[in-house]
């Protein structure tokens, strides 16, 4: 199937196994509208493995029918994001030494899911987590257009006081925006209106801002009327590796600023 909005992403595992620094183990990740995330070996171009998002089973059925249609069949239609942790900074991602590599991806028009896989060992990937609009606290999640950003934020640390990685992403796209009446202001978005922060390892919700009722993990903002489909832009103003501010643009042409002051999530506004 075609590759539309996804694009090949190179992962350099370095001098892993029989590979060397001069001839590193390089893999390529890409999603397709058949519903698969593929990993290929760069040395031979052969597929190492493919992960299928089960929510896209209906898309496979439509492709099997092979009927002429004006509606495109979408699958994993979003770029992937890879985050690595090279503990000894030797340029090699060695899972036996505790190094980590994780891949995150949404579906864009393919659906309202966000996935995470552990690819620390590129030959044996492991499923980490999946969130969608049925997940508690994510009812506002729209089509997952907003490519997540990996970051560290104030107040989110492990037991040793080390900042834990998070994903920050917009609430997604509401396909009602495809209707010209929405652009004219006669229809309102009902999903995607917000910004989410989740734990990069577990997928647990850390914080959000949406029109939903205020809670310990959600800041209510009634003015969020439009879906946030674009990637957010985090800002580290003092270069300490921790995000101080997030900018997010919505599909209504508004630019939102989220401040993360101090060292406590409860002070975010």
Task: Report the location of each language-model feature.
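A fold-level detector for beta-propeller and closely related beta-sheet-rich head/sensor domains
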Residues: 1-269
């Amino acid at each position: 199937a075609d590759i539309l909005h996804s694009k090949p992403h190179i992962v350099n595992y370095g001098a892993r196994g029989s590979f060397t620094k001069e001839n590193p183990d390089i893999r390529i990740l890409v999603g397709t509208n058949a519903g698969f995330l593929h990993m290929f070996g760069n040395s031979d171009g052969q597929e190492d493995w493919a992960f299928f998002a089960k929510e896209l089973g209906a898309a496979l059925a439509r492709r099997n029918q092979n009927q002429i249609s004006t509606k495109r069949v979408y699958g994993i239609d979003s770029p992937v994001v890879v985050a690595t942790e090279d503990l000894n900074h030797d340029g090699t991602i060695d899972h036996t030494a505790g190094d980590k590599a994780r891949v995150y991806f949404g579906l864009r028009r393919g659906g309202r899911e966000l996935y995470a896989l552990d690819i620390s060992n590129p030959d044996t990937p492991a499923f980490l987590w999946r969130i969608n609009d049925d997940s508690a606290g994510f009812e506002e999640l729209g089509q997952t257009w907003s490519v997540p950003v990996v970051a560290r934020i104030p107040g989110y640390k492990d037991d040793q006081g080390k900042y834990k990685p998070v994903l920050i992403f917009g609430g997604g796209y509401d396909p009602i925006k495809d209707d010209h009446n929405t652009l004219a202001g006669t229809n309102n978005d009902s999903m995607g209106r917000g910004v989410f922060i989740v734990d990069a390892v577990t997928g647990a919700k850390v914080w959000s801002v949406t029109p939903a009722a205020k809670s310990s993990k959600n800041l209510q903002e009634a003015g969020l009327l439009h879906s946030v489909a674009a990637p957010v832009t985090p800002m580290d103003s003092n270069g300490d590796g921790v995000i101080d501010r997030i900018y997010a643009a919505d599909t209504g042409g508004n630019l939102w600023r989220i401040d993360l002051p101090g060292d406590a999530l409860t002070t975010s506004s």
